[in-house]
Design a protein with these regions (language model features):
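A short, active-site helix/loop in glycosyltransferases that binds the activated sugar's phosphate group
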Residues: 127-154, 159-163
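Short His-centered aromatic/hydrophobic patch
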Residues: 61-64, 82-88, 106
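N-terminal strand-loop element at the rim of the active site
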Residues: 2-55
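Nucleotide-activated donor-binding/catalytic signature segment of Leloir-type glycosyltransferases, i.e.
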Residues: 228-244
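Aromatic "clamp/platform" in nucleotide-sugar-dependent glycosyltransferases that forms part
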Residues: 245, 264
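A conserved mid-protein helix/loop that constitutes part of the nucleotide-sugar donor-binding site
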Residues: 1, 182-208, 215-217, 222-228, ...
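Conserved acidic donor-binding segment of nucleotide-sugar-dependent glycosyltransferases
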Residues: 296-307, 315-322
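Short hydrophobic beta-strand element within catalytic cores of glycosyltransferases
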Residues: 281-285
């Protein structure tokens, strides 16, 4: 989209198990998608637990071992950007054409166990560049002394899609139970990482003192039934609303009193950037890695997984004067420009060349 040499840059996406299938209509027609397998195995692979994910991981590794070697040696790309399931292409670099340079894109806070440390260290010479989404992750990788420091860069995720935002922000929030209601919003997968149990406990603790507020949780996940039972047990079901997955979170943010991120960890925390884009007041856990880098002094950070501190920061937010809130929003909105697609593209080009 942003390249001045569109005819010279050929971009190809490798689809190993059907992971790109649902995004086909969103991908530029000039970008080729190469499917390693006809069947979309992603629909059948076990997930939602560590053991199940390891089984899926091994299956994907074995299924695509020779296919990926054949493809890379046939195509001979200048660069191969590897992301999420990184061990297969990194291991196969032993068999790749030496022309192809591997760029390791670290996404999310990596668990640097013994195996991963050994693996990355062993293959470090085969990796051309490494990108990290946050300064904290960058420092973590540097301190482990796995790669040559000159190979490692901070590359912010391309979270902000301006065209999409401008379109979605025009949509009205036509939800009857939220009409004329003041509400706090939480957004994310309903998983242990997002820590929505803390959010529900927080709301129970403040609801008598601040009866004007409702709590809206947006997302789906394996903890949905647990959270629903918790809401009923605490007798707050009339004021807590689990809305499920929503294609447009902006209309919720734009109509909320504040956004709360309760996560145990992030890297960097996409929804914080989306909230800042909508000028929403932000209260976030001071979890690793990312929220503190984004918010700095322009929001309200509470101690990770600390209920009392969350309540304190919420009350501090309520007492903060509107002119101070506005000033914080303006400063934060300027900072998140580094999370646009254009900024990501320019930085990536600098890193590659």
């Amino acid at each position: 989209k942003y390249s001045k040499d569109k005819d010279e840059n050929e971009i190809t996406l490798i689809d190993a198990i059907g992971e790109w299938e649902k995004y086909k209509n969103q991908i530029n027609s000039k970008i080729q998608i190469i499917k390693l397998n006809k069947l979309n195995y992603i629909d059948f692979l076990p997930k939602n637990s560590f053991l199940k994910s390891r089984v899926s991981y091994l299956f994907i590794f074995l299924l695509n071992f020779f296919k990926l070697i054949s493809l890379i040696n046939k195509k001979k790309p200048d660069f191969l950007i590897v992301h999420l399931m990184t061990s297969l292409p990194i291991f196969l670099s032993l068999f790749f054409n030496k022309k192809t340079k591997i760029i390791l894109r670290i996404s999310g806070l990596p668990k640097l166990n013994f195996f991963r440390l050994f693996f990355w260290k062993f293959f470090s010479k085969n990796i051309y560049k490494i990108t990290c989404p946050t300064i904290s992750t960058y420092n973590q990788i540097i301190n482990k002394n796995i790669f040559d420091k000159k190979k490692i860069f901070v590359l912010r995720d391309p979270i902000i899609k301006i065209d999409e935002f401008l379109k979605k922000k025009k949509e009205n929030l036509n939800i009857e139970k939220l009409k004329n209601k003041k509400f706090i919003v939480g957004i994310g997968r309903l998983t242990k990482q997002k820590n929505f149990t803390l959010m529900i406990k927080f709301f129970k603790k403040i609801t008598n003192k601040y009866p004007q507020f409702h709590l809206v949780l947006i997302g789906d996940g394996e903890e949905k039934n647990i959270l629903k039972k918790m809401i009923i047990y605490l007798n707050i079901e009339e004021k807590v609303h689990i809305m499920g997955y929503q294609k447009n979170v902006y209309k919720f943010l734009l109509n909320s009193e504040c956004f709360i991120l309760s996560s145990l960890w992030e890297d960097p925390g996409f929804v914080i950037v989306e909230a800042a884009l909508t000028n929403t007041n932000i209260i976030s856990s001071k979890c690793p890695n990312g929220p503190e880098e984004i918010i700095q002094n322009e929001g309200f950070l509470f101690k990770n997984n600390n209920l009392n501190d969350l309540v304190d920061k919420f009350e501090k937010f309520l007492k903060t004067k509107e002119n101070i809130r506005y000033k914080n929003k303006v400063t934060l909105k300027k900072r998140i420009k580094q999370y646009t697609q254009l900024h990501h593209y320019k930085k990536l080009i600098q890193i590659i060349y």
